[in-house]
């Protein structure tokens, strides 16, 4: 089963490029809103790092989500797309002074703080602007996630967050400061997580920490559990919308949320992953000693995930219905790691065929680079190509 694409329109465009199916995106956003409506205390922020294409951001903002940003540039992108500043949260282990000042100037909802030195800088910069900054502390819960090692973020060995044993001390420091207001706790254990048991483990850890704080009569208004929900890379046509029902229900059943608390989520991949495809043209079919190579005009500069994470993306020859043959699908970049997949079954490939690399809406266009002096790929939505 292949995806449905406007192939005639594609033939008029310079490849490679990203294509975003806005129906899939809107269906995904609708599914999220349908589930979140069951839980009045839930609030969802879109993780801008997954995809900051302005046309994509605008559709997401129209759904009512907030924005989760990890740089000053992302804050600007979110504001340009119309996200209200009071629905923007700012995370990241290394926030520069100008980025903190930018967040203060816009009046964003919250800074997710990852160290005492960062807290001290935020307090100092807020004082200079005569403002009080809302802060939540990102706690490293030492919870592992069943995902690639490079995208785990909740283990003690990771660079992210404040260790659990330091939580009390950091909160005490914040409570003595005049220009920061401690409002919450933040967690994020990793990305592309499909095992709900990982989220249950996080809930158990959050419950423990909440009990500990309440014993000290410290009440926390906001709990932010990050995101991490994965997508089905193997079956983008069969499961284009992730299982948000199970995801949100897991937290409803396992997290002991207090009546006065708001629970925040930061979803990225699960929002945009399945709506995007990288469209590439076959330059050559090369017969090697033991295998055939399909050489594309897209490479690791356009979609780095296979080279960086050994990630799998389903590939489809969308211009051929001939019998399947096995190919190593590679790009033109001068790196041996510029390989999208080995022994991939595709309908017989010829020069000029269009290959769609599916489930590329997240961490695709946004991570593209100009290595080898290549131009960045453009992004088009289905709304544009009607």
Predicted regions mapped to residue ranges:
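A charged N-terminal "starter" segment
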Residues: 1-133, 172-181, 211-218, 345, ...
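Charged (often Lys/Glu-rich) extended helix/loop segments that serve as interaction or gating elements
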Residues: 3-4, 260-386
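Conserved, mostly hydrophobic/aromatic
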Residues: 25, 49, 71, 103, ...
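Hydrophobic "anchor" residues on beta-strands that sit immediately upstream
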Residues: 45, 134, 222, 262, ...
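Active-site beta-loop-alpha junctions enriched in small/polar residues
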Residues: 47-53, 70-73, 93-95, 114-116, ...
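Short acidic, glycine/serine/threonine-rich loops at helix termini
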Residues: 57, 80, 100-105, 122-125, ...
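Hydrophobic residues within beta-strands of alpha/beta enzymes
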Residues: 67-68, 88, 111, 185, ...
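Active-site loop/helix belt of alpha/beta enzymes
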Residues: 142-284, 346, 372
């Amino acid at each position: 089963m292949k995806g449905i694409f406007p192939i005639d329109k594609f033939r008029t465009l310079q490849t490679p490029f990203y294509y975003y199916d806005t129906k899939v995106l809107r269906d995904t956003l609708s599914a999220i809103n349908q589930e979140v409506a069951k839980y009045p205390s839930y609030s969802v922020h879109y993780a801008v790092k997954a995809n900051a294409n302005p046309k994509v951001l605008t559709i997401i903002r129209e759904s009512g989500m907030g924005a989760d940003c990890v740089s000053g540039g992302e804050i600007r992108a979110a504001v340009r797309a119309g996200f209200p500043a009071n629905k923007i949260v700012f995370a990241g282990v290394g926030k520069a002074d100008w980025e903190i000042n930018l967040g203060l100037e816009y009046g964003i909802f919250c800074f997710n703080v990852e160290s005492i030195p960062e807290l001290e800088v935020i307090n100092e910069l807020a004082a200079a602007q005569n403002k009080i900054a809302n802060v939540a502390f990102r706690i490293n819960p030492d919870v592992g996630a069943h995902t690639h090692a490079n995208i785990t973020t909740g283990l003690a060995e990771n660079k992210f967050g404040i260790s659990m044993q330091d939580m009390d001390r950091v909160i005490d420091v914040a409570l003595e400061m005049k220009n920061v207001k401690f409002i919450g706790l933040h967690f994020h254990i990793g990305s592309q997580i499909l095992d709900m048991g990982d989220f249950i483990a996080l809930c158990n850890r959050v419950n423990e920490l909440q009990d500990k704080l309440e014993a000290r009569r410290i009440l926390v208004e906001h709990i932010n559990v990050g995101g991490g929900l994965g997508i089905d890379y193997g079956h983008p046509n069969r499961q284009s919308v992730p299982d948000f029902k199970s995801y949100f229900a897991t937290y409803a059943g396992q997290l002991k949320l207090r009546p006065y608390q708001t629970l925040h989520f930061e979803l990225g991949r699960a929002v945009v992953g399945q709506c995007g495809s990288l469209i590439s043209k076959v330059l050559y079919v090369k017969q090697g000693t033991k295998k055939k190579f399909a050489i594309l005009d897209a490479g690791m500069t356009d979609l780095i995930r296979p080279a960086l994470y050994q990630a799998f993306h389903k590939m489809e020859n969308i211009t051929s219905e001939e019998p399947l043959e096995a190919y190593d699908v590679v790009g033109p970049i001068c790196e041996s790691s510029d390989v999208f997949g080995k022994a991939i079954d595709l309908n017989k490939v010829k020069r000029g065929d269009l290959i769609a690399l599916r489930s590329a809406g997240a961490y695709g266009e946004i991570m593209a680079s100009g290595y080898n002096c290549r131009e960045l790929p453009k992004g088009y939505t289905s709304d544009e190509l009607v």
